[in-house]
Design a protein with these regions (language model features):
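Flexible, solvent-exposed loop/hinge segments and secondary-structure transition points
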Residues: 2-153
Length: 153
């Protein structure tokens, strides 16, 4: 086949597009577990940062393990609340946090919003509340940590 013909160029381009698409699809599917684990680790790190916990491990330490250890050490409880402040039985706060946008899409009376309870070395209890709102170009989100009196940030 003549390598300078239009037919050759079209066939070659089509084969290359299909091969690259297959490689990218395989890479995306095979790395999905790691992506989910990294997102979960990032959320845990952000929760810890909101209460002032250092999430940077010592040089050479595994960051994922360090954040998980810190999370287990400081975050003692997670629960969900309704609009009126009542606690939802059996709700997993971390699972709700992963899909917080879908909770905000629901009517206010149907929302179940996560709250996390932390206790530091001195026994000070803090409550961490995820917040989400609209910004100029998209959603803005973060975490607010309140002391036990629910007034002090």
């Amino acid at each position: 086949m003549n390598k300078n013909s239009n037919t050759y160029i079209i066939i070659y381009s089509t084969v290359m597009v299909v091969v690259v698409a297959l490689v990218l699809a395989f890479a995306s599917l095979s790395l999905q577990g790691r992506q989910n684990a990294n997102e979960e680790n990032e959320m845990k790190g952000a929760l810890l940062s909101s209460i002032g916990v250092n999430i940077v491990p010592e040089k050479g330490a595994d960051k994922t393990q360090f954040i998980n250890d810190q999370y287990d050490k400081y975050i003692k409880n997670g629960f969900a609340v309704k609009e009126d402040g009542s606690v939802v039985d059996g709700a997993n706060a971390f699972d709700i946090l992963k899909n917080l946008k879908s909770e905000y899409d629901k009517p206010a009376s149907e929302r179940e919003l996560p709250v996390f309870e932390s206790v530091d070395e001195q026994g000070v209890v803090k409550y961490i509340i995820p917040v989400r709102g609209s910004g100029l170009w998209g959603a803005i989100w973060g975490y607010v940590a309140l002391n036990e009196d629910w007034n002090t940030i």
